Amino acid sequence: MKNKYELLSLETDEQCQESSEPEKKWQQLKESINYANENAPKIERKTKKVWMTEEILTKMEERKKAKNTSAYEPKNKEIQNLCKKEKDAWYNNKCDEIEKYLNLNGTKKMHSCIKELTGDNKSKPTTGCIKDKEGKMLFERDQVLERWAEYVSELFADERPSLPEPSNDRGPPILKSEVEKAIKMTQLGKAPGEDGITTEMLKLLEDFGIDKLTELFNLIYASGQFPEELLMSIYITLPKQPRATDCSNFRTISLMPHTLKIFLKVIQGRIGTKIDKEVGPTQFGFRPGSGTREGIFCYNIIAQKHLEVDKDLYTCFIDYSKAFDKVHHEQLIQCLEKIGVDGRDIRVIANLYWHQKAAIRIQNQLSPFTSIQRGVRQGCVLSPYLFNIYTEFIFRECNELQGINIHGQNINNLRYADDTALITDNQENLQRVVTKVREESSKAGLEMNVKKTKTMIISRKPEDKKVEIKVGDEILQQVHKYIYLGTEITEEARSDIEIEKRKNIAKEKFSKMAGLLTSRKLKIKTKIRIVKCYIYSLFCYGCESWTLSKVLEGKIEAFEMFCLRKIGNIKWSDKITNERVLQKLQTKRTLLSDIQKRKLRYYGHVKRSNNILTTAVEGKLEGKRPRGRPRNTWMTDVREWTSLPASACTSQAADRSLWSVIARRPLQRR
């Protein structure tokens, strides 16, 4: 392939040598890559029932010819027996493959086999038809495509000015090393865009091809002009719920050319760090070393700090309506100019956003291409950074409003991308913050979904507390619990309800995988490893923010024994003790100790980070502790498990190697 590519490139290179047009360079590059790969083996699609045989299909045809029950039933029974036999044989072969890949450390192939057996690749069923604006059902394919084109056009329609020109022409040429790094970071096995070029093809280019790709990228970077094909995206619709018929009940994923993705990875490397420095510490989304864990942890710790000194925490959980699709492109470019992004980078982003088009694909048929006039691009590596800086300028206008004061620092919001929690210490301050955030968000085109935006009071006596926050003429609903970043927050800031919820989610997943996890074909050791990967990981989501008691620790161990008894096919009615179960399976309880170690390691991470999380853990709030026995706090767990006073925990956690030893050793039980 490499030789074929080089030969064709050398033949056509002379024709385009003097050309400075990105379009011609792109057509040459695309033709060369596709020609070199035209005889490459194609990936075969898998059938729905891979165990189905020609013999069974033939028997089914014979069954159709049966004219009465006496003729039909024997044939039907024979087919059922054949299906069971073939399915069992296929199942056993897959189990053997799992064992083989496990022994060879082929984890990717092992997980692929597990998904085949458990049916995790199944998509939600759809009717194939959708409703128009008036709610009338559309059945014809042309009508469905036309409706999708209309929906996309209306969703992304905006009145924007002509293409802006950057205030400077700064920006160094793109280096070959940058392109090589971007290609190396690109994942394999991803669907191509309209050009048909896959990541596997681009990874085969090697030095000669990468030189040509770098030339193309520098032409685009210097002029800001993109080849037309690179600006075309294809949207694939996925239903949010089974049998969805309304366009708004679908989510779309975007297929774009991988060549463009690599180019944008280069741009990301240039502007990503600059944007991240400008984003405030209360934004946890799309940032290195940060995620939902940090957002959940920070909110829970702040809530506990308020309860320690008998103060209430007033919260408004904001839900924006399609926030990523409502970004105004003109304001986005202005944000980039304000933080000093190079002119060439701004020009590239502006041209990309002003000239992009998209079409919807329904069963291999495309709707007409539509201009996308607002919103950040779906599936683009730049979008998270651009959205973060866009919303940062909204909240900069609100930072001076009073929220909570912890360790001398005013905090009135916690964010993960568009998931926002506004926090204050009283109703009046919360009303001011909500009003200001709504006002600034509206200026930027983002609208609150009033029906889904909720308020809550974290308090020692929540039943006596009421809060009325207005958005326009509507009063926001006050709730007793709220799912924030996938974890359930309650008005008493306890972990018991969240742990019960995680247990139920994990049990539901276990029941879906029960056929595999209770199979006698797999070794117990393999099943335990699968349980740890698929079941325990679901259960432990957000466990770093849990505050545990002796009762909750007992519930965690009971859930672990439930899983172990199931995979060992041991019933409760067998009256076998937990210790005997562990001996029979030749294993030990590990779930609780793993959670404890994760919490301790996370405390060390927080202590050494010296950021808002450190402030939340170590900071003090004004106020006095109430009378009576104090509640267990997050730090209570750390002190009791390590048998160290708070001051020793603080000093020793600052030493990574020392704290690592403490987190690994057997921990003190309550």
What are these regions (language model features)?
Residues K67-N68, K203, K322-I339, L414-K443, ...:
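Catalytic palm subdomain of template-directed nucleic-acid polymerases
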Residues M1-Q27, S32-I33, L104-N249, S254, ...:
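Surface-exposed loop/turn segments and immediately adjacent short secondary-structure elements
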Residues D169, M448-H480, V581-K588:
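Short, conserved micro-motifs composed of acidic
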Residues R270-Q283, L386-A417, A421:
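Active-site palm subdomain of RNA-directed nucleic acid polymerases
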Residues V152, F156, N168-I389:
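Conserved pre-catalytic core of RNA-dependent polymerases
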Residues M1-E38, D473-W546, R598-R601:
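Basic, alpha-helical interaction scaffolds
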Residues K30-I33, I56-K64, Y72-K87, Y91, ...:
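Short amphipathic alpha-helical coiled-coil/interface segments
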